[in-house]
Amino acid sequence: MFTTIKKTVIGLFTIVRSMWMVNSHAIRPRDTILYPEVPVPVPPRFRGRIILSRDPDGDERCVACNLCAVACPVGCISLQKAEREDGRWYPEFFRINFSRCIFCGLCEEACPTTAIQMTPDFEMSEYVRQDLVYEKEHLLISGPGKYPDYNYYRVTGMAVADKPKGAAQNEAAPIDLRSLLP
């Protein structure tokens, strides 16, 4: 008789506890969100879609050095180098296959000109796989991106067309080493 009462009390406690849990979850805020209507919060350093940025002057920053394609662990970046009349290199074509990209950010780290930048945009779903191959026209943006004042050619000291050494902006005239000899 004692075991029957014990089993009945344990059974009632289990039922009351289960009902309490169900009712407490009914009034709690929902864990799931309605995705298209409610935007997903992304962290500040989120690595999303890749873009190609421009210099503050408006020229494209990419010098087709191919470091991004070499750094990519899955080989989803391909480009071909060409040269302008002033001697500056540029990519004739720049192609990223986002169906293979793992968004690791190694291409952004390898880029010496900060042309490749990762954005927080992650909505790139397509019905056709070939639409995930982005060309240079799709990747280029009109602004400088994350680094608005950075210009690769000014930082590296590359010769500016139609200006001798030392005549460019923020550049000192070269020193004559023979004048320093005793």
From Swiss-Prot:
It is found in: Cell inner membrane. SUPFAM superfamilies: 4Fe-4S ferredoxins. It catalyses: a quinone + NADH + 5 H(+)(in) = a quinol + NAD(+) + 4 H(+)(out). Residues 50-82, 92-121 form the 4Fe-4S ferredoxin-type domain. The keyword Cell wall biogenesis/degradation does not apply. Its cofactor is [4Fe-4S] cluster. One of its GO terms (biological process) is aerobic respiration. Pfam families: Fer4_7. [4Fe-4S] cluster 2 binds at C72, C101, C104, C107. Keywords: 4Fe-4S, Cell inner membrane, Cell membrane, Iron, Iron-sulfur, Membrane, Metal-binding, NAD, Quinone, Repeat, Translocase, Ubiquinone. Its EC number is 7.1.1.-. It comes from the Bacteria. GO terms for cellular component: plasma membrane. NDH-1 is composed of 14 different subunits. Subunits NuoA, H, J, K, L, M, N constitute the membrane sector of the complex. Belongs to the complex I 23 kDa subunit family. This is NADH-quinone oxidoreductase subunit I. The lineage of its organism: Bacteria, Pseudomonadati, Pseudomonadota, Gammaproteobacteria, Moraxellales.
